[in-house]
């Protein structure tokens, strides 16, 4: 298929060049069988010592001469980072960021093949355009500069700064001495091109000019399939083909290539976007990525500091915009149950904390600020947020991943759905700043009440009319994007197709638009974009052309308002040297380390650490830990994985602070793996001896918190070959928050939720089933060995977590326990041991007294568990933490220990969110 397509492109381009004409947009017929590309990688950590910013020589000059409109603190343009900057980076397990997969250079792991969607040809392959640099006339009130990145900066006197490609074909129109971009290349100044006019008028003008099918194509958000490059895009580059075919949005998974390099790549995308489809700029979105080491999600929540959240949001937005990113697919504000598989991406289990952190973060992300910190509203340092997952995705039954069939339902046995919506209606829809409201991303699952009745019928979030009606009820009017895969491409058992399994792709698109969605998350990329037009045609056939066009006009209008507010129609280009200078600065590294320090939670300290600064370099024993590699995930299905031995903490980082004693890993002696090489076994280790450890000051054990996810035994991967399920009984494994195996004798039976097939409702209960030992059980064994061999040497456990766990296996073996959410904060923990930093964080999840306490917990009700009490009598409850003075008791603990919120304050929904009105 690729060879045929390449040959076709060559022929098309040759004809175009010879004829010196443009080909009108057209999608070719084809199967859309561009294969998946998926290689999971970790994003590298920026380091002032080991990594140099690209374009370093130009960085100082770039920082001094920023874009004229970029209002912000230029004396300290960016903060964040550190040698251990990436909080998702760690030894595996919960440390890896589950939502970051990069295929090839930047493939989208959520993207499907598009079923019967037509593969896009190079829809408007254009003959070479002569370079164009405007020449201001005698009465011009603007200046023109060709930037080092080869785009043209046009600065209007008292007006907007424009960015223009030299080769897009777009030229300048001069009116009253001011410059405007002739984006549709018609030689006249259209309303949407006139930056003096109100955004609402401009957006409506452009929406009115476009045909229904053009709007459908533009609302695709399935790019970018082309290879990462810092050069102009080749004519047959998949991302260029997508843009010329009419697509305008997509998620980047290439930010790890560096800020400056990423800025060059996004400039290349925007150059193609400017050349076609009315010159509409591309929306380049990103999942939360921590590229400067700034904390987020549960790590940020553990500070319980909304002011810090605002500062991080402001700095993160500067960084993203400098690299060419305009929208964040986040934050994730699901109110997490104790066993939620995606808990690590949330702000924890409490509605008040989630409300405060999310509101502060989104408000700061979306605004641009002047040098005095005054909110200017939308501007060149603003990033639009799609807050997710509206609404209620934190209480899937069993905590199961809602990407999967097993996570098809969120359950609300405590009649508490409204609490899960507070952050939306009282927070991000009513921001205190000038941008007023964020966008949303819909959830995958179907919400059901205590009796198993669905809120809005058997429809996933993207199709759920009831959940959309709540938005209409309060007058919500911003962008709504779906989560990835809801229109197909990931199989019928994955990706939120629920309720639409029997519909064609075109029918799904039509239904989604009719129910309320605007932007098609993850859909419409290379090989799929033609299907968007098919979806519009289907919608028009169902409800008539006039109404179909009106629905898409409103969606397009919302999109244009966002992009015009961000200034993208005027200036979509970025200064690559400036991007490098603010992302990899020393200030960035220092602030990143500061935020990580503030997030670490100390839950036990038997008088071992006092905060007194150490004058000599201590010696520590750091054992290796064993993991089986087993996983059960929606992407890869059930995988036995590859067993591994690794140090529990980064020895290179620890070596900067301590003299390190550790174990020795021998040759692997297990059975051969798929690659023919032997696998590691538990016996392939030589532990440090008592004599080697005797003169150590501390034993420091790095561990990944215990968690085994609940999943269906017939789980299939969204990617890869189907499993052979012959002879495998279908049932649900229980979740577990302990290292040892667990039999769920006290679990709910029957389940609340279940799909009805042939008139019979399935029972998803896992009562009596056994969760196997945690894949990281070897981490507990390392602690057990350390405790046995340590003698009088203090044992310190550094545990990386994404939720709670049962501490009966761990706490009695430790003198000190540090909790780092999302990933090990190795630098921070080392600095605390040395007395260079003080613990500040607080638990954002209750820590259960037992697995039975978890089984008794009501899925949708926060903070209702019996909590673990340690040997010192401390209860590991929500908002518990210690510093050098003992148990923390401050304004944070007093505020967030209050009873959990249950009601939206800005609107009265009555009782409609307690129980469902329909089956």
Model-based region annotation:
Residues 18-33:
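Sec-dependent signal peptide cleavage junction
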Residues 13, 23-25, 41-43:
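Intrinsic disorder/low-complexity segments, especially N-terminal tails and targeting/processing regions
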Residues 1-7:
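Positively charged n-region of N-terminal signal peptides that target proteins for export
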Residues 10-20:
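Bacterial N-terminal signal peptides
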Residues 74-114:
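Long, intrinsically disordered low-complexity tandem-repeat segments
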Residues 30-37, 42-57, 61-69, 81, ...:
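Glycoside hydrolase catalytic-domain context in secreted enzymes
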């Amino acid at each position: 298929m690729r060879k045929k397509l390449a040959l076709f492109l060559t022929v098309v381009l040759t004809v175009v060049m010879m004829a010196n004409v443009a080909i009108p947009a057209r999608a070719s017929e084809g199967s859309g069988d561009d294969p998946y590309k998926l290689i999971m990688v970790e994003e590298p950590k920026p380091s002032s010592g080991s990594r140099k910013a690209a374009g370093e020589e130009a960085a100082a000059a770039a920082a001094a001469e920023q874009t004229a409109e970029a209002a912000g603190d230029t004396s300290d343009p960016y903060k964040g980072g550190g040698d251990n900057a990436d909080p998702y980076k760690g030894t595996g397990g919960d440390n890896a960021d589950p939502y970051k997969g990069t295929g090839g250079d930047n493939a989208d792991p959520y993207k499907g093949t598009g079923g019967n969607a037509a593969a896009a040809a190079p829809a408007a392959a254009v003959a070479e355009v002569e370079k164009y640099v405007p020449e201001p006339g005698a009465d011009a009130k603007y200046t023109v500069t060709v930037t080092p990145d080869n785009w043209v900066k046009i600065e209007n006197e008292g007006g907007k700064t424009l960015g223009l490609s030299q080769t897009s074909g777009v030229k300048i129109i001069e009116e009253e001495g001011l410059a405007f971009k002739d984006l549709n290349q018609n030689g006249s100044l259209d309303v949407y091109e006139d930056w003096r006019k109100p955004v609402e008028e401009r957006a409506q003008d452009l929406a009115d000019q476009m045909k229904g099918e053009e709007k459908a194509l533009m609302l695709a958000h399935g790019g970018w399939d082309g290879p990462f490059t810092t050069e102009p895009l080749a004519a047959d580059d998949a991302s260029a083909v997508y843009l010329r075919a009419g697509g305008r949005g997509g998620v980047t998974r290439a930010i790890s290539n560096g800020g400056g390099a990423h800025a060059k790549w996004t400039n290349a995308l925007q150059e193609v976007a400017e050349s076609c489809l009315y010159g509409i700029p591309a929306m380049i979105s990103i999942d939360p990525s921590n590229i400067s080491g700034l904390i987020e999600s549960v790590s940020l929540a553990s500070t319980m500091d909304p002011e810090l959240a605002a500062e991080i949001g402001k700095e993160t937005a500067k960084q993203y915009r400098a690299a060419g990113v305009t929208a964040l697919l986040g934050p994730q504000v699901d109110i997490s149950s104790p066993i939620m598989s995606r808990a690590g991406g949330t702000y924890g289990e409490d509605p008040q904390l989630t409300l405060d952190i999310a509101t502060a973060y989104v408000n700061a992300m979306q605004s641009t600020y002047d040098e005095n910190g005054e909110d200017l509203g939308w501007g060149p340092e603003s990033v639009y947020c799609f807050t997710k997952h509206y609404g209620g995705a934190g209480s899937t039954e069993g905590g199961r991943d809602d990407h999967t069939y097993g996570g098809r339902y969120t359950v609300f046995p405590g009649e508490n759905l409204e609490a899960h919506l507070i952050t939306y209606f009282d927070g991000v829809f009513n921001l205190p700043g000038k941008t007023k409201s964020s966008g949303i991303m819909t959830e995958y699952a179907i919400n059901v009440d205590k009796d198993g009745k669905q809120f809005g019928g058997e429809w996933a979030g993207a199709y759920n009319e009831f959940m959309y009606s709540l938005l209409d009820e309060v007058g919500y009017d911003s962008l709504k994007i779906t989560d990835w895969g809801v229109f197909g491409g990931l199989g019928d058992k994955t990706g939120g197709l629920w309720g639409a399994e029997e519909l064609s792709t075109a029918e799904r698109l039509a239904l989604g638009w009719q129910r309320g969605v605007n932007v098609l998350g993850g859909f419409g990329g290379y090989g799929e974009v033609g299907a968007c037009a098919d979806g519009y045609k289907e919608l028009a056939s169902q409800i008539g052309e006039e109404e179909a066009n009106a629905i898409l006009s409103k969606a397009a209008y919302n999109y244009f308002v966002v992009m015009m507010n961000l200034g993208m129609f005027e200036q979509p280009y970025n200064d690559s040297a400036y991007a490098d200078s603010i992302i990899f600065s020393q200030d960035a590294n220092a602030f990143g380390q500061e935020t990580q320090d503030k997030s670490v939670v100390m839950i036990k300290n038997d008088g071992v650490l006092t905060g007194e600064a150490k004058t000599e370099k201590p010696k520590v024993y750091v054992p290796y830990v064993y993991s089986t590699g087993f996983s059960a995930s929606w992407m890869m299905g059930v995988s036995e994985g590859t067993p591994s031995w690794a140090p529990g903490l980064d020895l290179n980082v620890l070596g900067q602070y301590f003299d390190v004693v550790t174990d020795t890993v021998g040759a692997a002696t297990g059975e051969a793996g798929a690659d023919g090489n032997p696998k590691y076994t538990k016996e392939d280790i030589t532990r440090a001896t008592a004599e080697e450890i005797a003169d150590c000051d501390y034993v420091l054990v790095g561990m990944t918190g215990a968690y085994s996810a609940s999943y269906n035994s017939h789980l299939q991967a969204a990617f890869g070959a189907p499993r052979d399920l012959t002879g495998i009984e279908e049932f649900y494994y229980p979740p577990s928050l302990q290292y040892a195996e667990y039999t769920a004798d006290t679990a709910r039976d029957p389940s609340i939720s279940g799909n009805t097939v042939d008139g019979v409702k399935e029972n998803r209960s896992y009562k009596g089933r056994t969760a196997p030992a945690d894949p990281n059980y070897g981490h507990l064994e390392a602690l057990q060995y350390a405790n046995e061999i340590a003698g009088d040497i203090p044992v310190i456990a550094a545990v990386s977590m994404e939720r709670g766990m049962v501490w009966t296996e761990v706490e009695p073996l430790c003198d000190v326990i540090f909790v780092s959410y999302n990933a090990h904060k190795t630098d921070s923990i080392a600095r605390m041991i040395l007395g260079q930093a003080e613990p500040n964080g607080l638990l954002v999840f209750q820590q259960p007294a037992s697995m039975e306490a978890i089984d008794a917990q009501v899925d949708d009700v926060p903070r209702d568990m019996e909590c673990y009490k340690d040997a010192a009598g401390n209860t590991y409850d929500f908002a518990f933490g210690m510093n050098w003075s003992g148990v923390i008791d401050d304004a944070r603990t007093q505020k967030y220990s209050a009873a959990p919120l249950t009601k939206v304050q800005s609107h009265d929904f009555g009782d409609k969110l307690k129980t469902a009105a329909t089956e």
